[in-house]
Swiss-Prot record:
The gene is iolC. One of its GO terms (biological process) is inositol catabolic process. Catalyzes the phosphorylation of 5-dehydro-2-deoxy-D-gluconate (2-deoxy-5-keto-D-gluconate or DKG) to 6-phospho-5-dehydro-2-deoxy-D-gluconate (DKGP). Its EC number is 2.7.1.92. Belongs to the carbohydrate kinase PfkB family. This is 5-dehydro-2-deoxygluconokinase. GO terms for molecular function: 5-dehydro-2-deoxygluconokinase activity; ATP binding. It catalyses: 5-dehydro-2-deoxy-D-gluconate + ATP = 6-phospho-5-dehydro-2-deoxy-D-gluconate + ADP + H(+). It is an enzyme of class 2 (transferase). Pathway: Polyol metabolism; myo-inositol degradation into acetyl-CoA; acetyl-CoA from myo-inositol: step 5/7.
Amino acid sequence: MRYIEFDEKRKFDIVPVGRVAIDFNPTDIHKPLSESRNFNKYLGGSPANIAVGLARLGKKVGFIGKVSDDRFGEFVVNYFKKEGIDVSEISKAKNGESLGLTFTEILSPTESSILMYRNGIADLQLDVDDIDEDYIKNTKAIVISGTALAMSPSREAALKALRLAKKNGTVVIFDVDYREYNWKNKDEIAIYYSIVGKESDIIMGSREEFDLMEGLIAKDSTDEETAKRWLDYGNKIVVIKHGKDGSTAYTRDGKAYRIKPFPVKLLKSFGGGDAYASAFIYGILEGWDMMDALEFGSASAAMLVASHSCSEDMPTVEAIKEFIKKEKEEYGEMVARS
């Protein structure tokens, strides 16, 4: 069943817009960050991870973003090229801005934290002049990340991408992706999140992220009230995530589809959301039934929280299907389905 119609004649399946960074994950885990001495370097940032995830799943992917004019910027561009992601709309920062850096701390499978360096960074220098209408016209969907809205000029660039997408019939997916860095206050968050949320076709976010988006609209909404609100604005799918308690997708026909996490031996408690998003979007692009798309996303998320990296360990279609098969053989057919 198709919940959203995509223009199948377009060159790209998906084009994320916004944050790209470098992740440093410790190899000497189960220590506080102050004591870790050895790290592996990976591509990071939710839009970038989603781009890699969908490329691994066989989709034609582009990217709109800005990187540092240095070796880290080269690393990003070369990594994208290796994954088959189009880099023609990735530009270099002109005033010495650096790529965002993220250091992770893995104290235990359930206790992880993230330290981000987000001042004077390249991705927030994305400008309206960097947004090309023909590029957006040639993709089935764009993904706008909430972090792109945190500061100007990236904020205006993201809003231009949104307007051009609406003008040209390009599907808009809003990945709320809240990070406290760079925002001035909660009112600012609510204003810009709601601007994009009201114009999107799909919104994906945690309960806490929806609370931030609704900060100037309503307080203490239930999931059902939140879903109805954003569906009434025109969204076709609203996904509300509750971490270890699973997630629910709401659709315009009034239905709610619930999925649980797959049981897996955790290595870390971060990174699953980007894998979930890429695999879920894949299912929607393929026209799958909602429960199948959610199950695919949940399986991909489970695989990522059991691995060391985010981008590097994004799975293929075959790997996710094999994971689901093994999980169902061990735990039963309804292991993740509510």
